């Protein structure tokens, strides 16, 4: 059980919400603020004075006054008309994060929503009744309207859900959770819809995957150093301390730790080779830069996870209703775009190491890592697959945040595209996973070919894991299943856990 303290969520909590079957409860200390916000909205609605989002239309229709007897209909219509998402359902892990983030935002007491509505969301979450949310349809301002409308429609008994993974109607989902359809009061529909929770959830969910890939890439890169009989001298701490970048210093330390005591490395310590290619030698510089970007993105996304991104905002202590733009997800878009650059670069560097290993003139290994080259092609086309994926990632890494299209009759004339920026991270991460799987296979093959010398004590379990699932490549065979089984192990963090390094979300 995780107790949500609105405004004080942590990255480890968010990772657990996404990755584990934890349940949620709301910190009772938040109840007074929630109740005060709801009362403030009820008082404003009772007075009948125009207040945006409470008794007016929305967007370009903000100047249209809504009579008091139509306020409930206004909120219902808002939810139903905005549930216009398309595409595949959002991943279960992202939906869980989305609901938790929405609860945190509402729980800070500036949205004017009743606890009854929040309790219904928690009940659905804990019953594993998750809204079916189409993943496409948000431009990241005014908030993530369409995705959050699909979440909110379930509270009304409209739409679809997944009941413990099985697709069903919203009404069936409410019944399983022991709930009845809600009637939303003034502003409650808008409070549910307005916010950056979809883009932030997608960005966080994919960031956690990219963090795992980063750690896997450290391991794969270190194994490739041994496979290529590379030097460990470029990882000397003194080099990196002179430059001063924290990520670079930390990455170099990880490579030193992983390669410490390698018999392969000791066997060629006194060779006449002067310098390794950049894909080996400059790993701390490249991976360190990726690490710095990822850490900054995590800081931004944690702030956003704890933010109130509703509009308008209710200030119960003064009774004021202030319209602003906290729904504009530009910080999320920038963070996601930076994560895309890092994830694509992790894959790009791994692809270069694969290319190095299969090139006999660079690695000193048999061409394409196989004996009897010619009749056997070995890793030749596996590298082509890695190259295809790395190239695709370069296109996917183009920033989404530089684009904008005006909506709502030019009332909402600049948008963030944060949801797309966050969503495409999943494709980049998936591609990078397969690139790393191919590198792990190639590096393991190279290490085998360095016999009788072995890799380091820290990397020996990696070799054992790989060889426990895929045999040494002797002759050409149907190769795709080998890549698939190692990619599955990458997804399961089998190699990431070997890296002597952890992110804030894992602590």
Curated annotation (Swiss-Prot):
Organism of origin: Burkholderia ambifaria (strain ATCC BAA-244 / DSM 16087 / CCUG 44356 / LMG 19182 / AMMD) (Burkholderia cepacia (strain AMMD))
Primary site of residence: cytoplasm
Protein name, as recorded: Histidine ammonia-lyase
Family label: Belongs to the PAL/histidase family.
This protein's encoding gene: hutH
Top EC group: lyase
Location in or out of the cell: Cytoplasm
EC number(s) per entry: 4.3.1.3
PANTHER family in the record: HISTIDINE AMMONIA-LYASE
GO molecular function, one term: histidine ammonia-lyase activity
SUPFAM superfamilies according to UniProt: L-aspartase-like
Entry annotated with the keyword Lyase: yes
Pathway, per record: Amino-acid degradation; L-histidine degradation into L-glutamate; N-formimidoyl-L-glutamate from L-histidine: step 1/3
């Amino acid at each position: 059980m995780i107790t949500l303290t609105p405004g004080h969520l942590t990255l480890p909590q968010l990772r657990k919400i996404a990755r584990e079957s934890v349940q949620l409860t709301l910190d009772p200390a938040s109840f007074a603020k929630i109740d005060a916000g709801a009362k403030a909205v009820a008082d404003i609605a009772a007075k009948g004075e125009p207040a945006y989002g409470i008794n007016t239309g929305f967007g370009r229709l903000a100047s249209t006054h809504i009579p008091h007897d139509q306020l409930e209909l206004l909120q219902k219509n808002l939810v139903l008309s905005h549930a216009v998402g398309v595409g595949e359902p959002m991943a279960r892990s992202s939906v869980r994060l989305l609901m938790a983030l929405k609860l945190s935002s509402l729980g800070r007491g500036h949205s004017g929503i009743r606890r009854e509505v929040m309790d219904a969301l928690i009940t659905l979450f804990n019953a594993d009744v998750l809204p079916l949310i189409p993943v496409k349809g948000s431009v990241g301002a005014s908030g993530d309207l369409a995705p959050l409308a699909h979440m909110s429609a379930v509270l009304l008994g409209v739409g679809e859900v997944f009941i413990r993974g099985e697709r069903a109607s919203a009404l069936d989902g409410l019944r399983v959770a022991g709930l009845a359809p809600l009637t939303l009061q003034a502003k409650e529909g808008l409070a549910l819809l307005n916010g950056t929770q979809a883009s932030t959830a997608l960005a966080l969910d994919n960031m956690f995957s990219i963090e795992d890939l980063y750690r896997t890439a450290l391991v794969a890169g270190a194994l490739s150093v041994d496979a290529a009989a590379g030097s460990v001298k470029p990882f000397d701490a003194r080099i990196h301390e002179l430059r001063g970048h924290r990520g670079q210093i930390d990455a170099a330390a990880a490579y030193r730790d992983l390669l410490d005591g390698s018999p392969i490395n000791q066997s060629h310590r006194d060779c006449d080779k002067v310098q390794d290619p950049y894909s080996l030698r400059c790993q701390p510089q490249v991976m360190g830069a990726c690490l710095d970007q990822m850490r900054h993105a995590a800081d931004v996304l944690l702030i956003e996870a704890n933010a109130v991104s509703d509009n308008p905002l209710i200030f119960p202590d003064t009774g004021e209703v202030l319209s602003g733009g906290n729904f504009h997800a530009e910080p999320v878009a920038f963070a996601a775009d930076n994560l895309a650059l890092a994830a694509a670069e992790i894959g790009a560097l791994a692809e270069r190491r694969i290319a190095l290993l299969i090139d006999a003139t660079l690695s000193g290994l048999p061409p394409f890592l196989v004996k009897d080259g010619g009749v056997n092609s070995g890793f030749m086309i596996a590298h082509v697959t890695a190259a295809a994926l790395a190239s695709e990632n370069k296109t996917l890494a183009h920033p989404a945040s530089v684009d904008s299209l005006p909506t709502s009759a030019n009332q909402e004339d600049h948008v963030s595209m944060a949801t797309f920026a966050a969503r495409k991270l999943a494709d980049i991460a998936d591609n990078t996973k397969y690139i790393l799987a191919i590198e792990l296979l190639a590096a393991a093959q190279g290490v085998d070919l360095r016999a009788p010398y072995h890799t380091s004590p820290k990397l020996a379990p990696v070799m054992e894991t790989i060889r426990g699932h895929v045999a040494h490549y002797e002759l050409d065979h149907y190769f795709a299943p080998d890549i698939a089984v190692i990619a599955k192990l990458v997804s399961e963090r089998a190699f990431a856990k070997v890296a002597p390094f952890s992110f804030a979300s894992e602590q």
